[in-house]
């Protein structure tokens, strides 16, 4: 599975759509399979994010005795991952994200980095290379 360019906890800017220009923290990242082949394998997958305070939708919920009251609740709706841009924690600008692999001795580390300021954002993975 490929590493995600946007993760839970990142601050993002909405760059397209009705909510354009709004910022928020990513609460959840998930994928939705849109189409499968004859064997049942996913062919077309879209990735979505839930951003705090952005794309608020109203849901009508039934009451559940002892759990919740019924009525209309307001919750965040999904936004396609292509419509948001990460805000770099170093330079505080919306940026594209790249991946950088750094080898130090027998350890290979993969970092997400900001393409504007060229600084590492965080560590994605770390592997120990077997000596040869």
Curated annotation (Swiss-Prot):
GO terms for biological process: translation. Coiled coil: none annotated. InterPro entries: KOW, Rib_uL2_dom2, Ribosomal_uL24, Ribosomal_uL24_CS, Ribosomal_uL24_KOW, Translation_prot_SH3-like_sf. GO terms for molecular function: rRNA binding; structural constituent of ribosome. CDD domains: KOW_RPL26. Keywords: Ribonucleoprotein, Ribosomal protein, RNA-binding, rRNA-binding. It comes from the Bacteria. GO terms for cellular component: cytosolic large ribosomal subunit. Belongs to the universal ribosomal protein uL24 family. Part of the 50S ribosomal subunit. One of two assembly initiator proteins, it binds directly to the 5'-end of the 23S rRNA, where it nucleates assembly of the 50S subunit. This is Large ribosomal subunit protein uL24. It comes from Aquifex aeolicus (strain VF5).
């Amino acid at each position: 599975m490929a590493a995600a360019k946007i993760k839970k906890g990142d601050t993002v800017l909405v760059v397209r759509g009705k909510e354009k220009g709004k910022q928020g923290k990513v609460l959840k990242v998930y994928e939705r399979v849109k189409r499968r082949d004859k064997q049942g394998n996913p062919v077309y997958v879209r990735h979505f994010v839930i951003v705090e305070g952005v794309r608020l939708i109203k849901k009508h919920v039934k009451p559940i005795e002892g759990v919740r009251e019924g009525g209309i609740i307001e919750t965040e709706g999904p936004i396609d991952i292509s419509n948001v841009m990460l805000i770099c924690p170093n330079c505080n600008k919306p940026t594209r994200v790249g991946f950088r692999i750094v080898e130090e001795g027998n350890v290979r580390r993969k970092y997400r980095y900001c393409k504007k300021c060229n600084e590492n954002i965080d560590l994605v993975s770390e592997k120990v290379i077997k000596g040869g």
